[in-house]
């Protein structure tokens, strides 16, 4: 959870730099996300009981197996890229809508020109900040059990997770709605329609989790596990050939 979430933050910033665009996040935004929307759910995941019977029924790891084997590394990369993708989508939404209104040709240069306007950049950063924060909360819910749908889990077995996610959403809303916090974080208030749009984007990590669980239950090998296993076997074959 933490590795994929932090990778999402890094990729969000790195992609904007490569495109020559202003930063989607301010330093205060990153600090807030790391302290609030990362830390609280991570603590809740750390004390999650999970299903002990199922865990004990799984075969043990071999001594030579990496901690990131069986799709672990692939999952980190996938969710990190997904979180970065939806955060950048939110960031681009504001200038894109203005470009559409003015019938301007879509290009990175035009996008950068619109983002040079202070009000446009401020709202775009608010969008990216909100999605990055909320998506990690949704992501934490799915990470309670990567092999089980959230509808099959028992949410009240980990009340700390409910509290962590609830507090996370309230605090994330506070930084865009409370005047004294909007001044500190340089954010703007959002309308109901904007909140619904950003919440919809933020759900994607959880939707991806449910999709992978569904594929696995239907007899399809878990995509992340298959990719990770293929990569491991490829590396092992190369070592043998050497």
Predicted regions and their residues:
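C-terminal transmembrane module of polytopic membrane proteins
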Residues: 3, 46, 68-70, 96-242
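Membrane-embedded transport module
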Residues: 1-148
């Amino acid at each position: 959870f933490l590795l994929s979430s932090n990778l999402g933050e890094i990729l969000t910033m790195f992609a904007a730099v490569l495109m020559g665009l202003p930063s989607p996040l301010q330093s205060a935004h990153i600090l807030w996300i790391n302290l609030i929307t990362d830390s609280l759910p991570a603590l809740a995941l750390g004390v999650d009981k999970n299903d002990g019977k199922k865990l004990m029924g799984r075969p043990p790891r071999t001594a030579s197996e990496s901690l990131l084997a069986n799709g672990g590394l692939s999952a980190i990369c996938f969710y990190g890229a997904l979180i970065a993708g939806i955060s950048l989508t939110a960031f681009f939404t504001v200038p894109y809508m203005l470009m559409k209104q003015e019938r301007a040709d879509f290009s990175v240069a035009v996008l950068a020109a619109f983002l040079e306007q202070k009000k446009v950049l401020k709202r775009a950063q608010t969008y990216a900040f909100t999605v990055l924060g909320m998506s990690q909360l949704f992501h934490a819910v799915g990470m309670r059990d990567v092999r089980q749908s959230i509808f099959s889990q028992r949410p009240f077995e980990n009340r700390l997770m409910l509290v962590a996610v609830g507090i996370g959403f309230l605090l994330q809303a506070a930084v865009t709605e409370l005047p004294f916090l909007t001044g500190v974080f340089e954010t703007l208030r959002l309308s109901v329609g904007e909140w619904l749009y950003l919440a919809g984007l933020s759900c994607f990590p959880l939707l991806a989790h449910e999709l992978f669980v569904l594929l696995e239950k239907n007899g399809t090998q878990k995509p992340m596990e298959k990719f990770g296993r293929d990569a491991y076997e490829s590396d092992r074959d190369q070592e043998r050939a050497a």
